[in-house]
């Protein structure tokens, strides 16, 4: 899915091609400057040819998305250069919350590109301080197993139970996504920050359901129990996780089934 992986399925409508004047910086040249984080060159280009700011590529990305999507690795110099370049683009009029493409209510914002592709926390923090919405990005942070990114996003107000994908066929919270990818360190961090351990997707599936289905190692189940996971929540087939665990030959699973909670719970998203 695009919200976690680099490639997107759905693209937003894109503006038509812009037309540069003679002798002005071309779009290929502008692209090279953006990707190399040449903030001074970018500043000159948009000053000489403001029409460049209207450009969006075939995937809906503008220059800010492209800047944020450059993977800087551990190069702190590139992080500083990326912030300066992003600042030029934002100050020149590019919206800090403009999406490149969408999936339902979910949006691929510049911040999402910084988290998902650039893995650029200094730039992400800059965008947040400039007013970027912190939502839509926790799936990417969890997919990347990026604990500092998860903490940064939630610390700036991201909804740890982000519901922006509830209208999609494959609806899942960031926590449930982490469980399905077997990225348990990310799942645990989300739980510590308040994620709903008993989230049910449209199929009624919970974290224990998916872990049992995938054959996840039993050592990860106590994490769910410690955060109040229930075992009596039934999926769309009427099967609850505790029932499946009681049928296991492994006595540890049967013991953990008895430790799962049974308190009242909301209905799955429809």
Features from the language model and the residues they span:
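Ankyrin-repeat-protein effector appendages
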Residues: 2-8, 14-16, 21-29, 156, ...
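N-terminal segments that cap or nucleate solenoid repeat domains
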Residues: 16-66
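Ankyrin-repeat boundary/"N-cap" motif
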Residues: 23-30, 56-73, 99-113, 133-140, ...
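Ankyrin repeat A-helix N-terminal signature
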Residues: 32-37, 66-82, 113-120, 140-146, ...
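Ankyrin repeat structural motif
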Residues: 39-46, 75-91, 118-128, 146-155, ...
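Ankyrin-repeat inter-repeat connecting loop/turn
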Residues: 52-53, 96, 134, 160, ...
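Eukaryotic tandem repeat interaction scaffolds
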Residues: 140-145, 155-192, 196-202
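Ankyrin-repeat and related helical/solenoid repeat scaffolds used for protein-protein interactions
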Residues: 184-185, 192-239
